Swiss-Prot record:
Known role: Catalyzes the production of spermine from spermidine and decarboxylated S-adenosylmethionine (dcSAM).
Protein name, per record: Spermine synthase
Gene: SMS
Boundaries of every PABS domain copy: 121-361
Binding site for S-adenosyl 3-(methylsulfanyl)propylamine: Q147, E219, D254, C255
Subunit architecture: Homodimer. Dimerization is mediated through the N-terminal domain and seems to be required for activity as deletion of the N-terminal domain causes complete loss of activity.
Family per similarity comment: Belongs to the spermidine/spermine synthase family.
CDD domains for this protein: AdoMet_MTases
Residues with the N-acetylalanine modification: A2
Length: 365
């Protein structure tokens, strides 16, 4: 698959830098490449020069009157064109040093962005920053009735599970699993545990080691389990090979009817672990259906949680303070009064600090 390589080079010059001098000084570099020039001039807004090559590559040179100079180049992502672009950028950078006469305040050359490649390496963080992962292979890519399921291989993080474009868990992310289980502070031996979601098998694998009485995991998507038991074995071990074990069972069902059924039956758990979804980024809880789903899960979970039990869940990126505050407000609106604590954890593949919550019912007077 042919991909496009987008390279950038930025200069911040002193306010007295002359745009016309810079434009004329750089023209010869592009002309040497056989590129066709087109220049647009605005009296108060500087210059825009476009250079087009016969091989389909092109460059935009934008010179602002306050000293900002931006160069954007697009080319095919091939070795030959990549070397040509690097050479061109080097020449522009050297020429700019000559033209600016030491008035350059800042030079910024970012790694090129490859667009439209066979492997997508770019995934935004929860707070909207762009991250390029060191993905070198698509391990698994299938559409289930519920979502797109990708497992991609990272040189640093191992295989990464990505659900509908959202980075879920990598083989490196034991820190996530430990945090959503209480960070090693809980005694699971002889306890009844309910896991909501968790199709990667990480939580189930770790809890089974702690000799619980019974773990019930409710996962709606069989295809997530199928992909993870084959390609995420460093995370799940062999617990997903069978849907039933000595101390666990996996139900392939929607968790909401299951929670309602358990609540009606009066069934209770020592621990409920919600691994379904992060706190929504939206700050309109009355309008966003994800918030409605989250509130429903919270209320139903409290109904099946023992009075002295604990509810664990992920929050979101530590920078999303407004969304996290809204989540904490929702905790105050449940059918029963609760208290909570939170912990900030570094999950390797997330490349951002992540908040985890522990919720418990207030003691009865």
């Amino acid at each position: 698959m042919a991909a496009a390589r987008h390279s950038t080079l930025d200069f911040m010059l002193g306010a007295k830098a002359d745009g016309e001098t810079i434009l004329k000084g750089l023209q010869s570099i592009f002309q040497e490449q056989g590129m066709t020039e087109s220049v647009h001039t605005w009296q108060d807004h500087g210059y825009l020069a476009t250079y087009i090559n016969k091989n389909g590559s092109f460059a935009n040179l934008r010179i602002y009157p306050h000293g900002l100079v931006l160069l954007d180049l697009q080319s095919y992502d091939g070795d030959a064109q990549g070397k040509e672009v690097d050479s061109l950028l080097n020449k522009v950078e050297e020429r700019m040093k000559e033209l600016s006469q030491d008035s350059t305040e800042r030079v910024k050359r970012l790694p090129p962005i490859v667009r439209g490649g066979a492997i997508d390496r770019y995934w935004p963080t929860a707070d909207g920053r762009l991250v390029e992962y060191d993905i070198d292979k698509v391990v698994y890519d299938e559409d289930s009735p519920y979502q797109n399921i990708k497992i991609l291989h990272s040189k640093q993080f191992g295989n990464i599970l990505i659900l509908s474009g959202d980075v879920n868990l990598a083989e490196s992310d034991l820190a996530y699993t430990r945090a959503i289980m209480g960070s090693g502070k809980e005694d699971y031996s002889g306890k009844d545990v309910l896991i909501l979601g968790g199709g990667d098998g990480g939580i189930l694998c770790e809890i089974v080691k702690l000799k619980p009485k019974m773990v019930t995991m409710v996962e709606i998507d069989q295809m997530v389990i199928d992909g993870c038991k084959k390609y995420m074995r460093k995370t799940c071990g062999d617990v997903l090979d069978n849907l039933k074990g000595d101390c666990y069972q996996v139900l392939i069902e929607d968790c909401i009817p299951v929670l309602k059924r358990y609540a009606k039956e009066g069934r209770e758990f020592d621990y409920v672990i919600n691994d379904l979804t992060a706190v929504p980024i939206s700050t309109s809880p009355e309008e966003d259906s994800t918030w409605e789903f989250l509130r429903l899960i919270l209320d139903l979970s409290m109904k099946v949680l023992k009075q002295d039990g604990k509810y664990f869940t992920q929050g979101n990126c530590v920078n999303l303070t407004e969304a996290l505050s809204l989540y904490e407000e929702q905790l105050g609106r449940l059918y029963c009064p609760v208290e909570f604590s939170k912990e900030i954890v570094c999950v390797p593949s997330y490349l951002e600090l992540w908040v985890f919550y522990t919720v418990w019912k207030k003691a009865k007077p």
